[in-house]
Amino acid sequence: MIDTHDITGLILAGGRGSRMGGVDKGLQNFRGLPLALHTLMRLQPQVGDVMINANRNLAAYESFGVPVWPDGLADYAGPLAGFLTGLERCETPWLLTVPCDTPLFPPDLAARLAQAAMREGADIAMAAAPEADERDGTVRVRTQPVFCLLRVTLLESLVRFTQGGGRKIDRWTEQHACAVVPFDQPGDDPHAFYNANTLAELHALEGLGLR
């Protein structure tokens, strides 16, 4: 069993926000709070500690009361750069990554990923959720690679991968024992993994999960 206090949560807020017009996603308003602060409040009960990966407006993120770390890799290198920063700074055996733009993620995310990691003896546990195919509307369960529980012993592997130019999460995770955890059970929120790439999508999310 993985104890809650053996997991550090990492909020990924280091992106460019290009599809939001270049704004800092994590600081956009969601139900009266900055999006990253809402994410922090949802994540904190699930883990022992939380930190934020951000690359601008660091003082604003620091005001949330948790450590804030920028990417070590240059030029907004993507989520794996955040993974790398988190693994470098993590002081617990496990790191749980959560993006700042998916505010309805499950309240039992950490517990279910941890159970799967232990059950399968995996180094990584990754969430999966139903998604409609844009072409034909068919609903399939797809992995959500930014929602990952990682052993901190994977740091050396990720350093090698990124130094070799690797930037895609799935290309790295497929090198390791990875448990995939589908969040498609009765009672699971079908909107839990909806993310906001635009301000319109963010406003639409505000009305979900309240009914």
Curated annotation (Swiss-Prot):
GO biological process: bis(molybdopterin guanine dinucleotide)molybdenum biosynthetic process
Localization in the cell: Cytoplasm
Keyword Thylakoid listed: no
Xref: Pfam families: NTP_transf_3
Residues that, per the record, bind Mg(2+): D101
Highest taxon of the lineage: Bacteria
Family indicated by similarity: Belongs to the MobA family.
Protein's UniProt name: Molybdenum cofactor guanylyltransferase
